[in-house]
Amino acid sequence: MKSLHDVLKRPVITERTTDMMAEKKYVFEVPLKANKTEIKQAVEKVFGVKVEAVNTVRVPAKPKRYGKYSGYTSEWKKAIVKLTDDSKELAFYEGV
């Protein structure tokens, strides 16, 4: 990876992930080649928190159609990051 900011592409914000934030679990989209160690280091350095665990999931490509044209969405990887109890919360909704 080039830098720690390249490891975390974007936070995944859905109804389910918003409920997970109460348990101090946060979900990020990460590159397919990123490993758990890189993800942990990136979250700790960028947000200044301590990470307890990292789980990763490869989201498979899904078939899509647009009229007679068919194709697939891109495969991507998400990381579920659990923070320690004494870590501060990450503020994704600041200024909204």
From Swiss-Prot:
Q: Which Pfam families match?
A: Ribosomal_L23
PROSITE patterns this protein is in?
RIBOSOMAL_L23
Instruction: Return one GO MF term.
Output: structural constituent of ribosome
Keywords in UniProt for this one?
Answer: Ribonucleoprotein, Ribosomal protein, RNA-binding, rRNA-binding
GO CC terms in record: ribonucleoprotein complex; ribosome
Some GO term, biological process aspect, for this entry: which one?
translation
What is the superkingdom listed in this entry's lineage? Bacteria
Its quaternary structure? Answer: Part of the 50S ribosomal subunit. Contacts protein L29, and trigger factor when it is bound to the ribosome.
HAMAP family the record matches:
Ribosomal_uL23_B
Family stated for the protein in its record: Belongs to the universal ribosomal protein uL23 family.
UniProt function note: One of the early assembly proteins it binds 23S rRNA. One of the proteins that surrounds the polypeptide exit tunnel on the outside of the ribosome. Forms the main docking site for trigger factor binding to the ribosome.
Q: What is this protein called?
A: Large ribosomal subunit protein uL23
Q: Which gene encodes it?
A: rplW
